[in-house]
C-alpha cells in the first residue's frame, strides 16, 4: 500500500486560506474526525454526515468540505485509516444513495460527488481507488482514461485465475492416478491384516506413495484427502489406528498432539482436577476447540451435507471416524458443527417436541369413564359394511424424519469416551440425555469410570477379603460336556474377538465374541476422581446434567445411594448437599425406574439417616411438586393411578396373593400415589381395609415409610371434616382410616408408629380431641386389648382375677398371641424410646377432665361431647392395661409419675390420679406373694393398709387432706379415703367360676391335643404348655383366695376408725346428721366419681358398699346410703353422665338392686345378712353416741324393709319416667341404658312397669331422633316380655291382700327338660308326661308367695289351675306307686357323685385349697376317662393358642354321663309333679328352659318321703354348721357371691354359659351375675322347701275344697286354649 502524497507549498497556503474561511459551525466535525478516542463506527458516521450535507442536502459548500478533510488529514497521524473510510463512503454514495434515493436531483448530486472525488483523490492511495471504486466513477474523477477498457481487463484476469484447471479432482479426469492411490492403500491394508510388514514401515511407505502419486498425476490434494477419509470410514473397525497414523504424518496432521488422562503425570492430573473442581465440572476449552478452519473439516462438512441430502442412513462408521478425528485433535468441534444438519434452531425445538410427546402420552394414559367401561358392540350392516356404506379413507403415510447428524456425532463422541467434547454439546443441549436414552446410557458409562475409585471405598465388596475378591474376578469354569453324569469343569476358552460399532456389544451381544472396536481405549481420557471433594464438585454436576435420564441406569443410582449412606454425617453442609441430591435426583428417579426392590432398600438406607420430619418433607415434595414439575413424572403418575385403580377394583380376599403382588409392583416406584388412592378408597369402603393390609406384605421399607407419611397426610388434611353432617359422631372416613392404621401397624414390624403417636400428642395439645379414635385403634389393634364397652360380662369378671386370668380375659381370644405379643413390644419400645408413654398418660389424664370443654360452639352437641368423654376414658384404659401388660415393675414405676406429681404438677383430678396409681399396684393392692416386688406388703407386721412398707401407696397425709375441704374429715378419715381409692376389685372379689372355666377349657385342649395326629415332640410341647397354664391358674386361684382373706382381715381391724373418727363432738359441737352426711359424702366423693370410671370400678363400688355393710362398719348406715342413692338427685345425676358412664352406673345399680331384691324375697336372708341379731349397723334406726351395741329393737324389721323397698321402687319409677318423658337427649339416652341394665330387678310392680311401658311406647312412637327411637323400641320389647312377671304394688309391698283380678292371671306352666331317651322302666311315666305336656301353661308371677309372710293357703287358683292340680295329683300317685324308695336312694347317691353335683356343692360354700385339689383330681379323672376313641366327640383341631377358645358348642363326651342324665331326668319328672301349684318366688323368672331347669333343681328336696326329709334335715344341719364354722360372719359376702354364682345354670340366659366370644360351655356357668329364678342360696332353698312340705301336707285337703268354691264363684274363661296360646305368642 502506498502512502498519502505530500502536500506542496501552494496546497498548504490554500489550506490555510480555507481554514480562515471555516466558521465555528464546522469546527466540531474536524474534531470528530481526528479525535483519538473515537471508534470506527463514530468516524464513519461523521464522514457520511459530511458527505450527505455536501452532496445531498447542499448545506456544505464544496470548498469548505475540502478544507475540513484537508485539516483532518493534516492533523491525523493514521492517515490510511481515514483514507479507507473516505473511499468506502465514495463507493456507497456512487452506487447506492444517489441512484436509489435522489432520482430527481441525480445529475447535480453526481456532479458534486465527482468534484469531491477529484479534490480528495490527492489524499487517497491510487491502488485503493482502483480496487474499490467503480470503473466509470474512476474515469469521471480522472484516475483512469477509459473505464470500459479497465472493466474488460478485470474480467479476463479473473477468468484466467479462477477457471483454468491445473489439478484433477474428478476420478474420470485422472483415473489412473486415483487407481494407483487406491491400490497402494489396499496393499497396505492387506499387509497390515496379515502382519507381513511392520506397521510403522507401512505408514511411512504409504505417506510417500500419497505424495508421489499426487505430484506424478497432478491430483487434487483435497480429493485425495476425501478418498483417504472414505477408506478410513469403511475400514474403521480393525484399521482405525493405521489410518490415524497415516493422517498424523501427512500434511493434514494436527498442529499439536493431544495428551490423554492416562498419559498425564500425577502433578498435571492433580492440577487438572483442581481446576475442574473449582469450575464445578466445566472444562476449560482450549484452542483445540476453536481452531481456525482447516481443509479436513471443509472436506468432511461437504461430504456430510451431501449425505444428509441423499438420505444416506449408513453414517454410523462415518460419525465414528469424525469423532476419532476430533478426539485426536485433527479437527475441532466448532469447525465441523456448522456443516451438520439440522440447524441449531431446529435442534433446540427437540425439547418442545419431547414435551408435547409426553403430554400426549399422559393424556392417553389417564383413565376415564368411557375407557374404563366395557367395550360397546359394533354396529354393522349385514354384509359387514359400515353404517354409512363408505370405505374408510386411507391414512396418509407419515414420512420418516431424517436422522440428526448432530445427535449421531454426539453418540460417537460418547462411545469413544471423548467426555470433554461431549460436555461441550451437552452443556448447550442438556435435554438430549432425557429425550434419547441411548445417549444417556453412553454418558453414564463414562461416569461409572470417573467415580469408580471413590465407589470402591464404599462398595460391599470392600468388606470381603482380598482373596475372595480376586476369585470373584476370575472367569467361571464351565462343564466340558453337560450330557455326562459326572461333570468335569474347565476354564472357558479364549474368545475370538469380533469388532462392532455397538458400544454395548459386550453387554447385548448376539455372540460371545462380539466387542466394541474401541473398548480398549474408550476410558483413556476420562478423569478419575479421587476424593469426596472432587466427587461433590465434579461428579455431582455431571450427574445433575443427566438429571432424570439417570433412570435408564439403576446401577449408577445404586452407587450414588451407597456413597451417600457412608458420607452423610452430622455436618450441616453434608446433610444439606445430600438432601438436595435426594430431593432433585433420587426420589424422582425411583418413580421412573422399573421395579427394583434392591434400589428401593438402598435408597431407604440413605433416607433413614435423616429424621422422620425431614423424610416426610421430602415425600411431600416428591408427591406434589415433583410430579407436576417434570413431564416424565407426570406421565408415570398417570400410568400409576390407572393401574392402581384397576387393581383395587379387582382386589378381594380370595385373590390377595395375586393382586397384592401387582399392587406392590406398582407401589415400588410410586408409593405415595398408590397409597393415596388406596386410602381414599378405604375412607369410603370399609371392606377394603383387610385386603389392602394383606396385600401390603409384599412392599419394601421405603414403601412402608411412605405409607406412614400418606396416613399422616390424610389425618392432617384440613379440608376433611372430622364429624358427620349431623355433628354428633366421628366421620366415616376418619373411623375407616384409623382402623386401617391400627391393623397395618400391628401386622408389619417394618412400620414405625412414632410419627402417628407424636401427631396425636400434638393434636391433643391444641385441643383437637377428635383424633382420639386414631390412638384408640392403634392401641386396640397392636395390643390385642379391647375397651370396656367391647368386653363381655365374663371378660369383665375375669379381669378381676390375677395376672394370668386377667390376661386371658382381656386379650382377644381370636388373635394370634405371637403377633399381638410382637406388636405390643414394638409399640412399647416406641413409646419408651421416644419418651411418649408418660406424655400420653398425662395428656389423657388431663383431657379426661377437660375434653368436654375443649370443643367449639359448633361442635357442642351433647351426644358428641358424651362420646368424646367416653373415647378418652377408653383410650386411657387401653393405655394403662397395655403398659401394665408389657412393662416390668421397675420400668412401669418410672413411666407413671408419683401421686403428688399427678395432683400438684399436672393438675389431674384425684379419681384419675388414683386410677393411674392403682395400676402400679394392680396385682396386689394390699397383699402379695412375691416379696421381691416393690408392691408387696408383709401383712403379719402390718396393721393398716396405708403403711410405709408399701412404697407405691406411701402418700403423705397432707396431700390427701388437701384434696378435700377440711370439714369433710370430720365424717370420715383420710385412711378410709385412701383405702377406698387404692383397693381394686381384685381385693374384694374372687371370680371363682372363671378360674374353673379356664381350667376346664385347658383340659379340653389337652384332650384335643391328645386326639390330634401330630408329631410326638409337638404334642408333648403343646401338652406341657397347657398343663403349665392350668397349674398357673390353680396357683393363682389359691393366692387370690388367700389375698382376699388377708384383705378382709386387715379391713376388719381398720374399719373402726373410718367414719366419724373423732366422734360426734370433734370440735366441741355436735355434728348434725352425722351418719347421714357420712353416707352422703361417701356417695359424692367416693362412689359416684369412681363408678363412672369403668365397669370394673362400678362393680367394685357395689362390692365395696356391700363390704362396708358386711364388716359391720361403725357409724356407716347402709339404709342412709340407699336413701341417698334413690333420692331426687338421681335424674340430674343421670343427665350429667355420658353413655358409658350411664352403662357403668347401670351395672352398679343392678348389683345394688340385686342384693336388695334378694333380701326382699327371703326374710331369713335379710335377717342374717342385714341384721345379724343387731350386730350389723347398716339398717339401724336409732344410734347411740358412744357405741353401736347389738339391739334388735334399733334395727329395721323385715316388714318395714319391705315397705321401704317398695317406696324405692316407686321413687325409681317416678325418676325414670320423668327422664323418658323429657326432651333432653342425655336424659332419655342414659335412662334407657340404665333401665336395660337393671331390667331383671326393676320394674317388678305392675304400676311401675305400666308407667315405664307407656313412657317407652310414647318415646318410640313420637321421638324423631333415630338413635333414641331405636333404643326405646328395644327397651319396650324387653319390657313387654317381662310384663307377665309383674305383681301389683299391694302384693309387692304386702299392705293389702290381692283381689281376685290380681290373682293368678295365667296358669302355672309345667315344663320338662328335653332328653333324647328314656329308660324302659319309666315308659308309663312318659305316657303320662306326654299328656301333661299338652297342657303346658305359664307361670303366675302374682302368686301369693310373693307377698311377705303370706302362706300358700291364701292363694286362689283359677278353673284351669284346679283341673291341672287334679291331674297332677293323679300323676303323682301313679309315680309314687311305680317308684320305690331304694331307687330314689340310689339316684340320690348317684347325683351326689356326678361332677355336676360336686360343682353344685362347691358353689354353696367358700372354696378352700382342698376343694381346688379335689376339683383338679376330678378333672384329671375325666380327662383320663375321656381319652378313649369312643368318647371323643370334640374336633381334632390342633390349636397352638393357649388362650383361644373353640367357637363351637362343647359337648359331653362320656356315654355314662348321658345315661346318668336320662336317669336324673326320670327322677326330676317324678319330683316335679309333687309341686302341685308351687309358684316361683323370683319375679325375674322367664318362661324358658333355663327357668325350668332352675325350678327343677330347687324343688328336688321338696318332694321326698318323710324319711328322706328327715335325713335331708340332718344333712342340711350338718352342712349349715360346717359352712358357718368355715366362713363365719366375716365371710358372708363371699358365700353369697359364690352361692349365687353356683346357680348360674338356672339363669334366664340358659343352662350353658358363654365366654368372651360367645362359645357355650356346659361344664361351668357364666361369671356374670345370674338372672335366674332361684336367687337364694341352696341352704335357704332347703329350709323353705321343708316348710312348704309341712304346710302342704297339712292343707292338702282344704285347698281342693277352696279351689272348687272359687271356681264356681269366678267367671269361666271361655277362651279356647289355642286362642290363649296365640295371645301369649304375640305378647312374647
Curated annotation (Swiss-Prot):
Keywords: Nucleus, Phosphoprotein, Transcription, Transcription regulation. Residues 1-10, 1360-1399, 1411-1429, 1461-1474, 1494-1526, 1551-1560, 1581-1628 have a biased composition (Basic and acidic residues). The modification Phosphoserine is found at residue 1577. It is found in: Nucleus. Signal peptide: none annotated. Residues 1-21, 1337-1628 are annotated as: Disordered. GO terms for cellular component: nucleus; THO complex part of transcription export complex. Residues 1476-1493 have a biased composition (Low complexity). GO terms for molecular function: DNA binding; mRNA binding. The keyword Phosphoprotein applies. It comes from the Eukaryota. Disulfide bonds: none annotated. The modification Phosphothreonine is found at residues 1406, 1408. Residues 1430-1444, 1527-1550 have a biased composition (Polar residues). One of its GO terms (biological process) is mRNA processing. Component the THO subcomplex of the TREX complex, which operates in coupling transcription elongation to mRNA export. The THO complex is recruited to transcribed genes and moves along the gene with the elongating polymerase during transcription. THO is important for stabilizing nascent RNA in the RNA polymerase II elongation complex by preventing formation of DNA:RNA hybrids behind the elongating polymerase. Component of the THO complex. THO associates with DNA and RNA in vitro. Belongs to the THOC2 family. This is THO complex subunit 2. It comes from Schizosaccharomyces pombe (strain 972 / ATCC 24843). The gene is tho2.
Amino acid at each position: 500500500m502506498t502512502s498519502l502524497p505530500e502536500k506542496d507549498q501552494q496546497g498548504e497556503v490554500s489550506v490555510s486560506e480555507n481554514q480562515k474561511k471555516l466558521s465555528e459551525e464546522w469546527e466540531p466535525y474536524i474534531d470528530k474526525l481526528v479525535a483519538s478516542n473515537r471508534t470506527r463506527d463514530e468516524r464513519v458516521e461523521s464522514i457520511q454526515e459530511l458527505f450527505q450535507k455536501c452532496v445531498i442536502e447542499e448545506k456544505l459548500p464544496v470548498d469548505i468540505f475540502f478544507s475540513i478533510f484537508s485539516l483532518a488529514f493534516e492533523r491525523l497521524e493514521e492517515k490510511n485509516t481515514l483514507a479507507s473510510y473516505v473511499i468506502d463512503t465514495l463507493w456507497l454514495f456512487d452506487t447506492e444513495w444517489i441512484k436509489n434515493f435522489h432520482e430527481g436531483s441525480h445529475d447535480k448530486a453526481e456532479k458534486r460527488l465527482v468534484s469531491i472525488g477529484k479534490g480528495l483523490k490527492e489524499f487517497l492511495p491510487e491502488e485503493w481507488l482502483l480496487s474499490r471504486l467503480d470503473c466509470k466513477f474512476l474515469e469521471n474523477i480522472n484516475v483512469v482514461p477509459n473505464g470500459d477498457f479497465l472493466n474488460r481487463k478485470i474480467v479476463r484476469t479473473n477468468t484466467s485465475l479462477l477457471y483454468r484447471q491445473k489439478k484433477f479432482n474428478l476420478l474420470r479426469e485422472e483415473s489412473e492416478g486415483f487407481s494407483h492411490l487406491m491400490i497402494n492403500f489396499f496393499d497396505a491394508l492387506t499387509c497390515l491384516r496379515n502382519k507381513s510388514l511392520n506397521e510403522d514401515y507401512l505408514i511411512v511407505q504409504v505417506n510417500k506413495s500419497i505424495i508421489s502419486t499426487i505430484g506424478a498425476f497432478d491430483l487434487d490434494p483435497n480429493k485425495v484427502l476425501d478418498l483417504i477419509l472414505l477408506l478410513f470410514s469403511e475400514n474403521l473397525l480393525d484399521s482405525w489406528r493405521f489410518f490415524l497414523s497415516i493422517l498424523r504424518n501427512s500434511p493434514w496432521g494436527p498442529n499439536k498432539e493431544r495428551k490423554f488422562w492416562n498419559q498425564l503425570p500425577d502433578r498435571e492430573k492433580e492440577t487438572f482436577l483442581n481446576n475442574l473442581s473449582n469450575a464445578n465440572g466445566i472444562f476449560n476449552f482450549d484452542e483445540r476447540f476453536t481452531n481456525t478452519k482447516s481443509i479436513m473439516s471443509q472436506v468432511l462438512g461437504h461430504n456430510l451435507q451431501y449425505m444428509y441430502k441423499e438420505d444416506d442412513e449408513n453414517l454410523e462408521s462415518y460419525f465414528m471416524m469424525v469423532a476419532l478425528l476430533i478426539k485426536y485433535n485433527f479437527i475441532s468441534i466448532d469447525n465441523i458443527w456448522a456443516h451438520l444438519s439440522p440447524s441449531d434452531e431446529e435442534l433446540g425445538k427437540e425439547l418442545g417436541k419431547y414435551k408435547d410427546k409426553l403430554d400426549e402420552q399422559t393424556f392417553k394414559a389417564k383413565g376415564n369413564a368411557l375407557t374404563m367401561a366395557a367395550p360397546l358392540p359394533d354396529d354393522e350392516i349385514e354384509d359387514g359394511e359400515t353404517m354409512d356404506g363408505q370405505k374408510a379413507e386411507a391414512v396418509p403415510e407419515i414420512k420418516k424424519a431424517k436422522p440428526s447428524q448432530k445427535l449421531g456425532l454426539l453418540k460417537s463422541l460418547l462411545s469413544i469416551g471423548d467426555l470433554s467434547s461431549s460436555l461441550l454439546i451437552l452443556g448447550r443441549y442438556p435435554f438430549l440425555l432425557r429425550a434419547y436414552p441411548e445417549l444417556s446410557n453412553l454418558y453414564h458409562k463414562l461416569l461409572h469410570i470417573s467415580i469408580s475409585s471413590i465407589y470402591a471405598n464404599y462398595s460391599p465388596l470392600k468388606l470381603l477379603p482380598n482373596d475372595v475378591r480376586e476369585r470373584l474376578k476370575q472367569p467361571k469354569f464351565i462343564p466340558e460336556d453337560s450330557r455326562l453324569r459326572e461333570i468335569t469343569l474347565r476354564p472357558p476358552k479364549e474368545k475370538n474377538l469380533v469388532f462392532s460399532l455397538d458400544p454395548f456389544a459386550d453387554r447385548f451381544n448376539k455372540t460371545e465374541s462380539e466387542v466394541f472396536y474401541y473398548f480398549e481405549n474408550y476410558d483413556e481420557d476420562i478423569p478419575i476422581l479421587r476424593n469426596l471433594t472432587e466427587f461433590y464438585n465434579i461428579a455431582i454436576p455431571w450427574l445433575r446434567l443427566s438429571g432424570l435420564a439417570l433412570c435408564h441406569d439403576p446401577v449408577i443410582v445404586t452407587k450414588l445411594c451407597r456413597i451417600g449412606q457412608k458420607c452423610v454425617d452430622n455436618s450441616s453442609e453434608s446433610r444439606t448437599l445430600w438432601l438436595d441430591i435426594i430431593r432433585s435426583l433420587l426420589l424422582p428417579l425411583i418413580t421412573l425406574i422399573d421395579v427394583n426392590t434392591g434400589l428401593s432398600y438402598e435408597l431407604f438406607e440413605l433416607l433413614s439417616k435423616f429424621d422422620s420430619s425431614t423424610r416426610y418433607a421430602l415425600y411431600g415434595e416428591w408427591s406434589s411438586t415433583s410430579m407436576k414439575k417434570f413431564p416424565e413424572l407426570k406421565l408415570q403418575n398417570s400410568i400409576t393411578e390407572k393401574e392402581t385403580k384397576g387393581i383395587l377394583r379387582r382386589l378381594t380376599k380370595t385373590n390377595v396373593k395375586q393382586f397384592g403382588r401387582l399392587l406392590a409392583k406398582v407401589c415400588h416406584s410410586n408409593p405415595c400415589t398408590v397409597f393415596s388412592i388406596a386410602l381414599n378408597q378405604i375412607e369410603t369402603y370399609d371392606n377394603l381395609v383387610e385386603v389392602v393390609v394383606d396385600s401390603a406384605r409384599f412392599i419394601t421399607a421405603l414403601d412402608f415409610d411412605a405409607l406412614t407419611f400418606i396416613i399422616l397426610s390424610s389425618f392432617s388434611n384440613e379440608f376433611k371434616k372430622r364429624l358427620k353432617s349431623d355433628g354428633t359422631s366421628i366421620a366415616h372416613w376418619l373411623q375407616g382410616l384409623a382402623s386401617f392404621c391400627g391393623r397395618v401397624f400391628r401386622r408389619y414390624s417394618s412400620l414405625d408408629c412414632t410419627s402417628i403417636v407424636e401427631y396425636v400428642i400434638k393434636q391433643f395439645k391444641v385441643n383437637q380431641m377428635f383424633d382420639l379414635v386414631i390412638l384408640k385403634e392403634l392401641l386396640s389393634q397392636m395390643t390385642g386389648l379391647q375397651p370396656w364397652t367391647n368386653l363381655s360380662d365374663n371378660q369383665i369378671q375375669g379381669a378381676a382375677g390375677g395376672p394370668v386370668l386377667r390376661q386371658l380375659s382381656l386379650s382377644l381370644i381370636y388373635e394370634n398371641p405371637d403377633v399381638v405379643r410382637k406388636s405390643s413390644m414394638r409399640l412399647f419400645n416406641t413409646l419408651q424410646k421416644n419418651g411418649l408413654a408418660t406424655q400420653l398418660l398425662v395428656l389423657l389424664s388431663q383431657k379426661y377432665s377437660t375434653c368436654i370443654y375443649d370443643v367449639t360452639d359448633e361442635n357442642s352437641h351433647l351426644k358428641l361431647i358424651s362420646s368424646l368423654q367416653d373415647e378418652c376414658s377408653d383410650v386411657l384404659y387401653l393405655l394403662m392395661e397395655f403398659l401394665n401388660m408389657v412393662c416390668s415393675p421397675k420400668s412401669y414405676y418410672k413411666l407413671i409419675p408419683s401421686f403428688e406429681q399427678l395432683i400438684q404438677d399436672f393438675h389431674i383430678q384425684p379419681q384419675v390420679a388414683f386410677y393411674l396409681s392403682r395400676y402400679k399396684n394392680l396385682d396386689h393392692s394390699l397383699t402379695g406373694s412375691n416379696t421381691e416386688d416393690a408392691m408387696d406388703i408383709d401383712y403379719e407386721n402390718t396393721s393398716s393398709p396405708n403403711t410405709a412398707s408399701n412404697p407405691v401407696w406411701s402418700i403423705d397425709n397432707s396431700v390427701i387432706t388437701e384434696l378435700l375441704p377440711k370439714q369433710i374429715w370430720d365424717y370420715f378419715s383420710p385412711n378410709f379415703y385412701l383405702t377406698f381409692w387404692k383397693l381394686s376389685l381384685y381385693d374384694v372379689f374372687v371370680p371363682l367360676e372363671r378360674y374353673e372355666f379356664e381350667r376346664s377349657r385347658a383340659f379340653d385342649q389337652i384332650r384335643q391335643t391328645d386326639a390330634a395326629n401330630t408329631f410326638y415332640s409337638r404334642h408333648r410341647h403343646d401338652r406341657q404348655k397347657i398343663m403349665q397354664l392350668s397349674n398357673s391358674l390353680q396357683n393363682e386361684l389359691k393366692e387370690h383366695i388367700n389375698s382376699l382373706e388377708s384383705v378382709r382381715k386387715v379391713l376388719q381391724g381398720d374399719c373402726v376408725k373410718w367414719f366419724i373418727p373423732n366422734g360426734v363432738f370433734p370440735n366441741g359441737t355436735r355434728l348434725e346428721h352425722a351418719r347421714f352426711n357420712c353416707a352422703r359424702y361417701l356417695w359424692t366423693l367416693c362412689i359416684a366419681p369412681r363408678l363412672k370410671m369403668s365397669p370394673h370400678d362400678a362393680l367394685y363400688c357395689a362390692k365395696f358398699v356391700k363390704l362396708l355393710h358386711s364388716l359391720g362398719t361403725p357409724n356407716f348406715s347402709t339404709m342412709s346410703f340407699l336413701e341417698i342413692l334413690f333420692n331426687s338427685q338421681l335424674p340430674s345425676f343421670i343427665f350429667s353422665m355420658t353413655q358409658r358412664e350411664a352403662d357403668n352406673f347401670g351395672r352398679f345399680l343392678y348389683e345394688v338392686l340385686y342384693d336388695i331384691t334378694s333380701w326382699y324375697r327371703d326374710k331369713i336372708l335379710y335377717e342374717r345378712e342385714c341384721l345379724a341379731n343387731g350386730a350389723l349397723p347398716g339398717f339401724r334406726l336409732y344410734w347411740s353416741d358412744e357405741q353401736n351395741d347389738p339391739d334388735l329393737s334399733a334395727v329395721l324389721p323385715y316388714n318395714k324393709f319391705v315397705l321401704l323397698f317398695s317406696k324405692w321402687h316407686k321413687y325409681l319409677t317416678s325418676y325414670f319416667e320423668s327422664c323418658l318423658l323429657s326432651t333432653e337427649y342425655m336424659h332419655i339416652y342414659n335412662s334407657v341404658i340404665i333401665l336395660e341394665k337393671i331390667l331383671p330387678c326393676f320394674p317388678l310392680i305392675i304400676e311401675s312397669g305400666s308407667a315405664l311401658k307407656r313412657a317407652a311406647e310414647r318415646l318410640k312412637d313420637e321421638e324423631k331422633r333415630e338413635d333414641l327411637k331405636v333404643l326405646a323400641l328395644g327397651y319396650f320389647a324387653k319390657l313387654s316380655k317381662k310384663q307377665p312377671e309383674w305383681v301389683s304394688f299391694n302384693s309387692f309391698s304386702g299392705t293389702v291382700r290381692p283381689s281376685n283380678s290380681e290373682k293368678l292371671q295365667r296358669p302355672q306352666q309345667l315344663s320338662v327338660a328335653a332328653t333324647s331317651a328314656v329308660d324302659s322302666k319309666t315308659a308309663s311315666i312318659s305316657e303320662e308326661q306326654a299328656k301333661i305336656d299338652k297342657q303346658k301353661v305359664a307361670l303366675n308371677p302374682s302368686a301369693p308367695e310373693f307377698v311377705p309372710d303370706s302362706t300358700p293357703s291364701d292363694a286362689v287358683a283359677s278353673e284351669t289351675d284346679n283341673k291341672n292340680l287334679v291331674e297332677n295329683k293323679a300323676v303323682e300317685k301313679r309315680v309314687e306307686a311305680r317308684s320305690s324308695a331304694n331307687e330314689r336312694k340310689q339316684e340320690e347317691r348317684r347325683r351326689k357323685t356326678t361332677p355336676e353335683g360336686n360343682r353344685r356343692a362347691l358353689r354353696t360354700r367358700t372354696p378352700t385349697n382342698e376343694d381346688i385339689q379335689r376339683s383338679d383330681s376330678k378333672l384329671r379323672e375325666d380327662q383320663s376317662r375321656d381319652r378313649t376313641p369312643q368318647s371323643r366327640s370334640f374336633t381334632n383341631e390342633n390349636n397352638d393358642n393357649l388362650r383361644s377358645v373353640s367357637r363351637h358348642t362343647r359337648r359331653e363326651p362320656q356315654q355314662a354321663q348321658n345315661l346318668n342324665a336320662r336317669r336324673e331326668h326320670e327322677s326330676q319328672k317324678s319330683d316335679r309333679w309333687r309341686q302341685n301349684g308351687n309358684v316361683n318366688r323370683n319375679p325375674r323368672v322367664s318362661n324358658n328352659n333355663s327357668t325350668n331347669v332352675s325350678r327343677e333343681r330347687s324343688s328336688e328336696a321338696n318332694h321326698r318321703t318323710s324319711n328322706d326329709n328327715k335325713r335331708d334335715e340332718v344333712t342340711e344341719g350338718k352342712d349349715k354348721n360346717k359352712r358357718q364354722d368355715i366362713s363365719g360372719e366375716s365371710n358372708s359376702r363371699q358365700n353369697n357371691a359364690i352361692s349365687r354364682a353356683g346357680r348360674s345354670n338356672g339363669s334366664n340366659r340358659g343352662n350353658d354359659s358363654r365366654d368372651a366370644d360367645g362359645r357355650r360351655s356346659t361344664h361351668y356357668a357364666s361369671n356374670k351375675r345370674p338372672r335366674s329364678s332361684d336367687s337364694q342360696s341352696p341352704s335357704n332353698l332347703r329350709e323353705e322347701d321343708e316348710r312348704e312340705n309341712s304346710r302342704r301336707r297339712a292343707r292338702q285337703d282344704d285347698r281342693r275344697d277352696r279351689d272348687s268354691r272359687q271356681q264356681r264363684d269366678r267367671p269361666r274363661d271361655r277362651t279356647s286354649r289355642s286362642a290363649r296360646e296365640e295371645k301369649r305368642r304375640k305378647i312374647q
